[in-house]
């Protein structure tokens, strides 16, 4: 359950995860396939109440700006992500095909 008192702790944890993602992605210059937990910000990342998200998150984007920046700069062929279960599907960022697998558990994609 979401409790406002946990927000500061959760934001600190999220900042650490963002910093870690930034450091990891800097090590990889030209990936063909990126598999990550969060979708890129603004793509397949909108939260609904379908899976019990708190009201203040509903309708908002919850993807990663770090991942979006990497995709725009490096243009890997494919990105596979999850995290935002209700936004499963496919999107395109430049030449990159982005797949949010949602909660499907598996997906067959011809490469």
Protein language model regions, located:
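Residue-level signal for functionally critical sites in structured catalytic/ligand-binding pockets
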Residues: 1, 44, 63, 81, ...
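Active-site-proximal loop/helix segment associated with metal-binding centers of metalloenzymes
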Residues: 1-60
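Short, hydrophobic beta-strand segments that form beta-sheet elements in well-ordered domains
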Residues: 34, 78-81
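Short secondary-structure boundary segments
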Residues: 38, 82-84
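Binuclear metal-dependent phosphoesterase catalytic core
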Residues: 65-78, 85-111
């Amino acid at each position: 359950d979401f409790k406002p008192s946990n927000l500061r702790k959760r934001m600190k944890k999220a900042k650490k995860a963002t910093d870690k993602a930034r450091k990891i992605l800097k090590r990889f210059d030209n990936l063909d396939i990126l598999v990550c937990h969060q979708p890129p910000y603004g793509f397949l990342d909108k939260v609904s109440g379908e899976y019990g998200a708190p009201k203040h998150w509903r309708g908002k984007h919850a993807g990663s700006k770090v991942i979006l920046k990497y995709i725009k700069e490096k243009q890997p062929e494919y990105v596979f992500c999850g995290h935002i279960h209700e936004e499963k599907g496919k999107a395109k960022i430049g030449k990159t095909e982005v797949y949010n697998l949602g909660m499907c558990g598996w997906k067959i994609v011809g490469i």
